[in-house]
């Protein structure tokens, strides 16, 4: 059997989608690897990319080149946000690179069965002939899919195309024959088709409940790559969580581009949380990220339940009202302070994280001082800081008053020092206390309910497998299983 290598860059959404694709390839009998670990011949490399910063794009190009060198006969299928916005530049890298649009990424759920059908019918043909046929199949699939519209309708088995609806391979010299009809179905590309019932690369399950964004932040072009906000219907979310719970999963992470824009009929994200808690029994629920405006009274009621992990990552970006206005953010510094106060009023010392952009055009020393002061005062235990990266097509790309890279780098370093100090203080607060935790993939570490990643320093005879829920006591910078 052949192998497929899957590599993922960027956000949790990308990781969820890659896990889903990996599960589908395994289901069709392919070996799946991440990293250079495969013993079977690798015929396809899937690279799920990010476009948040120019460095993310550079990393994607380096990875593509590495994979092309490592696997001289394999196809590099590049998808994700970078592939959506810059397909031509990626495909110009090599004839073996095919950029599959990120907006239609859910259509890749068809790919494993397509390639399995091709493999079954190729007979004893050499690997290069199979790869040739696969390249033609991928190109045909892409051509058909990009002409279709997107829909938020959940893909039922009758809605999804089957192996009898695969693209016809024509004009491919020496390609194995594939006796299939033209790709006449479906009339739309179903969103949320990439759903992982099992997880190969992570110990914790994740579900994508929302995609896209309707906001117009000056620095971000993810909305161009992923499109308008769309949500998975509430009953489908609950069904997927219940299925994970039935399989013994101890935790699920709910993720999306902008969870504050989740809507299913009259149900918003707070309502979704309430319903999940009501309709499940043991599984713990973690939220990937939040906007300050998401912290409403209804949301606070929902997170008061002990099965909602006390870990909240806020998309903050700046502590300066002036910079927030230039960024076109929909909240003020006062809103951030209020959101943090409200979260702490409901849960005891939750882990609070935030995203910070430094060096945004026009950011002064006073603006940066406001951001530092905010992060110090609010005691954010996790600070994800990165320098502003001008993205083509965004309002900020053409803004004047650019901050020199040297100054932006100094501000990044200063914020990282503060982040380390805040984290140490938070870890010290919980030292000696008991917490719930999930055993990580390596089984040598745990991730606590409040997002402390700790090495297991004493097992106490407790048998703990990856993904299992355990009680631990924090001891200095480690965990003792109870």
UniProtKB/Swiss-Prot annotation:
Entry note: cofactor: Binds 2 [4Fe-4S] clusters. One cluster is coordinated with 3 cysteines and an exchangeable S-adenosyl-L-methionine.
EC number, UniProt record: 2.8.4.5
Domain named Radical SAM core: residues: 199-425
Catalytic reactions on record: N(6)-L-threonylcarbamoyladenosine(37) in tRNA + (sulfur carrier)-SH + AH2 + 2 S-adenosyl-L-methionine = 2-methylsulfanyl-N(6)-L-threonylcarbamoyladenosine(37) in tRNA + (sulfur carrier)-H + 5'-deoxyadenosine + L-methionine + A + S-adenosyl-L-homocysteine + 2 H(+)
Domain spans labelled MTTase N-terminal: 2-120
GO molecular function terms noted in the UniProt entry: 4 iron, 4 sulfur cluster binding; metal ion binding; N6-threonylcarbomyladenosine methylthiotransferase activity; tRNA (N(6)-L-threonylcarbamoyladenosine(37)-C(2))-methylthiotransferase
TM spans (from-to): none
Biological role: Catalyzes the methylthiolation of N6-threonylcarbamoyladenosine (t(6)A), leading to the formation of 2-methylthio-N6-threonylcarbamoyladenosine (ms(2)t(6)A) at position 37 in tRNAs that read codons beginning with adenine.
Name of this protein: Threonylcarbamoyladenosine tRNA methylthiotransferase MtaB
Lineage, uppermost ranks: Bacteria, Pseudomonadati, Spirochaetota, Spirochaetia, Spirochaetales
Record gene name: mtaB
